[in-house]
Regions:
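Glycine-/charge-enriched secondary-structure boundary and capping motifs
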Residues: 2-9, 118-136, 149-156, 214-222, ...
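N-terminal amphipathic/basic leader segments beginning at the initiator methionine
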Residues: 2-37
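Short, acidic (Asp/Glu-rich) active-site segment that either coordinates a divalent metal cofactor
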Residues: 64, 155, 168-220, 261
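Glycine-rich phosphate/pyrophosphate-binding loop regions near the starts of catalytic domains
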Residues: 23-187
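Short, acidic Gly/Pro/Ser/Thr-rich loop/turn segments
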Residues: 17, 53-54, 67-70, 165-168, ...
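Acidic-glycine-rich active-site phosphate/pyrophosphate-binding loop
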Residues: 58-60, 66-68, 171-172, 206-210, ...
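Buried hydrophobic packing segments
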Residues: 24, 46-49, 91-92, 197-200, ...
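Residue-level signature of catalytic and energy-coupling elements of molecular machines
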Residues: 13, 65, 178, 254, ...
Length: 373
């Protein structure tokens, strides 16, 4: 008799997928908004757009991202409830850069084997971060890929949509000479540069359970620190009457892949130059540790890691005090780190690299000067 081959024998466990959905239901239900229609398990997530239709000229903003090789740290430690939090930060915080309010998000998880508790932990992290960001988690997909991924391997990605009034879009033409550059502290490495970090610690022979005095915890715990999610606080900042009265926020930049200078250059218009003084802040210990362990050149570390700055806000001088006070009150340490100049009159330091428009954006330029405290 010819042997029967089932889907389960091919490596796909439908029942495990169903169990994962049951385990994640409670957390997903908390990550919602009043506009969400329908429930978990539908073919499509639905979002009532009535309020959007009442806007003068609504513009939708969308973003897609992942968490890169940080998942390898989570897999090595078998800790999966923070990687979803990272995913939300990477996706929804990009949307806020243009002034939009993130509304809803979907996720995608590909794995070699569905372990219900692991999938539920990942989605639980996504849901917690969505709840914090005031974003609805309206759907997702878990795909089992036996033979393509090892049983303990997975990757995840997400996509989100937001909305902004056309008149309120934070475009580069809002930024002016004399604007002040504010740094918003990161929670650590966030979710960029982990291929470099992993290579460095492997080269140094450091185990993830190594206690690191400078961190006050293990290396693995430091590397899995969740990405700070700025979305809700920045949406509120853009609408705060005291900040608006001082001239409002002129620009925002999410410091992700490419580092501080490159991402700041993306939001500057041609003809403007930003000078950022490293002496205005001290990066958390993890950045110096990675650099010294791997003998990583300064230029490379700054093109790869956020160096303790997760977001940048550009504001007129009259809005500096109200903006920093607002963000400090929300638990986001914020400080003055530089200023915007006319490119023709900018104080260029010949000893430091000037970064011009990055990632395909033909914009302004940025120079990091000085040394960290």
């Amino acid at each position: 008799m010819t042997e029967q081959i089932t889907y389960a024998a091919a490596g796909v466990d439908v029942e495990a997928g169903d169990k994962a959905v049951e385990l994640m239901k409670a957390s997903v239900r908390r990550a919602t908004r009043p506009e969400v229609l329908g429930g978990l398990g539908g073919f499509a997530g639905m979002f009532d757009a009535t309020a959007i239709a009442r806007m003068d000229r609504p513009v939708l903003a969308t973003s897609t991202d992942g968490v890169g090789t940080k998942v390898a740290i989570a897999q090595a430690l078998d800790i999966h409830d923070t990687i979803g939090f990272d995913l939300v930060g990477m996706v929804v915080d990009d949307i806020v850069v243009c002034g939009a309010e993130p509304l809803f998000m979907t996720d995608y998880i590909a794995c070699g084997k569905v372990v219900p508790e692991r999938i539920a932990a990942i989605v639980g992290g996504i849901a917690r971060a969505c709840e914090q960001a005031r974003v609805a988690l309206v759907g997702g997909e878990t795909a089992e890929h036996p033979g393509l991924l090892d049983p303990d391997e997975y990757d995840c990605a997400g996509a989100a949509t937001g909305v902004v009034e056309y008149a309120d879009i934070l475009s580069p033409d809002r930024i002016r000479e004399g604007d002040v550059i504010l740094g918003l502290a990161s929670s650590g490495l966030h979710s960029n540069g982990y291929s470099l970090v992993r290579r460095v610690i492997a080269h140094a022979g450091w185990a993830l359970d190594r206690e690191v005095a400078e961190f006050g915890r293990t290396l693995g715990e430091e590397l899995l620190t969740p990405t700070r999610v700025y979305a809700a606080d920045l949406v509120d900042l853009l609408r705060d009457p005291s900040v608006v009265a001082g001239g409002g926020v002129h620009g925002l930049s999410h410091v992700t892949g490419g580092g501080l200078a490159a991402n700041l250059a993306r939001v500057l218009p041609q003809g403007l130059h930003a000078t950022v003084d490293r002496a205005t802040w001290t990066p958390p210990a993890v950045f110096a540790t990675v650099q010294s362990l791997g003998n990583v050149p300064q230029s490379d570390i700054e093109r790869t890691l956020n160096q303790g700055v997760g977001f940048v806000a550009l504001v007129p001088a009259d809005a500096v005090d109200t903006t920093t006070a607002f963000l400090d009150a929300r638990g986001i340490p914020t400080w003055v780190m530089g200023q915007v100049h006319d490119a023709d009159r900018a104080p260029i330091d010949p000893g430091h690299e000037v970064i011009h428009g990055a990632k395909g954006v033909d914009g302004g330029s940025v120079q990091l000067v000085g040394v960290h405290r």
